[in-house]
Curated annotation (Swiss-Prot):
Highest taxon, organism lineage: Bacteria
Similarity comment: Belongs to the bacterial ribosomal protein bL17 family.
GO molecular function: structural constituent of ribosome
Protein's UniProt name: Large ribosomal subunit protein bL17
Keywords, ordered alphabetically: Ribonucleoprotein, Ribosomal protein
BP term (GO), one: translation
Encoding gene per record: rplQ
A GO cellular component entry from the record: cytosolic large ribosomal subunit
Length: 149
């Protein structure tokens, strides 16, 4: 019975599955969209969304740090929370430039959005093995949609 079993195994051992998740998430954050199998897209979506949620919290702390004066006693606590969240994100990728991009560019776009940062669009089947392919992409924010129109 599969009671309370949430994650997909993708027919891989734990270390390979974790490496796959990190690789897919890295490509998604770098390029904004990736084409992969539907099973992999569904498996990586919660991983990406949790990272964006942590980055949003770090971005909010950074914004509050910038708004407060340097003499404020709570500013040190905010800085430590911001650094802790960035380190938690960095634990997955081990790339400071990518963490900076996630926290300072990507997460800022989703400050007003409560979840649902990615979308999966099914595009058909792969030619070689007929695996179902999907596009996993970051959802555009309202500010980007207004610029395009």
């Amino acid at each position: 019975m599969r009671h309370r079993v949430k994650k997909k195994k993708l027919n891989r051992p734990h270390s390979q599955r974790l490496a796959l998740m990190r690789g897919l998430a890295r490509e998604l954050f770098e390029h904004g969209t990736i084409i992969t199998t539907t099973a992999k897209a569904k498996a990586v979506k919660p991983f990406v969304e949790s990272i964006i949620t942590k980055a949003k919290k770090a971005a909010l702390y950074a914004k509050e740090i910038n708004e407060r004066s340097n003499g404020d006693p709570e500013i040190q606590a905010l800085r430590s929370k911001n650094v802790a969240l960035r380190r938690e994100i960095n634990r997955h990728f081990n790339d400071r430039k990518l963490v900076k991009k996630i926290c300072d560019e990507i997460a800022v776009n989703y400050i007003d959005r409560n979840g649902g940062y990615t979308r999966i669009i099914k595009v058909g089947r792969r030619r070689g093995d007929a695996a179902e392919l999907s596009i996993l992409q970051l959802v555009e924010t309202k500010s980007e949609e207004n610029v395009e129109n």
